[in-house]
C-alpha cells in the first residue's frame, strides 16, 4: 500500500502536534511545509475558506504531494466578527500572540457582550488543480475574558473561556482540547472525509 503523506500548509508547531495526533492512527504522515521548503502563501481573502484553499493548492503545487491547509480564527460578536481571518495578524506585523491578545482585550474594554467563537476550516487537495477539494468546518463557542489563564494551547487560548468547562482553552489538556475544540471538530470531519473520499482509512 502506498505511503500516505500529507503536507500541512503551516509552520505552526501547535497545529502540527494536533494534526499528527489526529491522523497518526490512520497511518498518515503529516509533514510541515517548512521541512519541504514551501514558501509562505499570501492570504489576501476575507473568508477562511478562500485563504485555506489558496494555501492548500500552493503547498501541493510546490511539493507534488497531497496537501491540507487550516485557516482559523476567533470571531467576537461585539466586534462584528473581528479578528476573524485577521486573527494571526490582528495587531499587525510581525505576528505576535501577546500583541494580538492585548489588542483584543483593549477593544473589548467596557463591553458586556464578550461572546466569541473559534472557527476552523480545513481544506485538503490531492494535487494543485484538484476539482474536488475536501472541506471540513468546526466551531467552538466561548467568551473572551480580561486576564490570561492556563499554560497550554496557543493564539488566543489563554483568554478564550469555555463556559461548558469552567476554564480557558489554555487550561485544557491536549486530549480535552482535541475533543472539544473547533480544530478537533474539523479534524474529525476531515478524517471521515479522507477515509470516505480518498480511501485513507
Place the predicted regions along the sequence by residue.
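Anionic-ligand binding patches
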Residues: 2-7, 13-201
Amino acid at each position: 500500500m502506498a505511503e500516505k503523506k500529507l503536507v500541512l500548509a503551516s509552520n505552526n508547531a501547535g497545529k502540527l502536534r494536533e494534526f499528527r495526533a489526529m491522523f497518526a492512527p490512520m497511518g498518515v504522515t503529516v509533514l510541515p511545509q517548512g521541512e519541504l521548503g514551501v514558501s509562505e502563501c499570501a492570504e489576501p481573502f476575507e473568508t477562511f475558506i478562500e485563504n485555506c484553499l489558496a494555501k492548500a493548492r500552493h503547498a501541493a503545487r510546490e511539493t507534488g504531494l497531497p496537501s491540507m491547509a487550516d485557516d482559523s480564527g476567533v470571531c467576537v460578536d461585539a466586534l462584528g466578527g473581528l479578528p476573524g481571518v485577521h486573527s494571526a495578524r490582528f495587531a499587525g506585523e510581525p505576528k505576535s500572540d501577546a500583541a494580538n491578545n492585548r489588542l483584543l482585550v483593549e477593544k473589548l474594554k467596557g463591553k458586556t457582550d464578550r461572546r466569541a467563537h473559534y472557527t476552523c476550516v480545513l481544506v485538503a487537495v490531492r494535487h494543485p488543480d484538484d476539482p474536488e477539494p475536501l472541506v471540513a468546518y468546526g466551531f467552538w463557542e466561548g467568551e473572551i475574558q480580561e486576564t490570561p489563564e492556563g499554560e497550554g494551547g496557543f493564539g488566543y487560548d489563554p483568554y478564550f473561556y469555555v463556559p461548558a468547562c469552567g476554564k480557558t482553552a489554555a487550561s485544557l489538556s491536549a486530549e480535552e482540547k482535541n475533543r472539544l475544540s473547533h480544530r478537533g471538530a474539523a479534524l474529525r470531519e476531515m478524517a471521515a472525509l479522507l477515509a470516505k473520499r480518498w480511501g485513507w482509512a
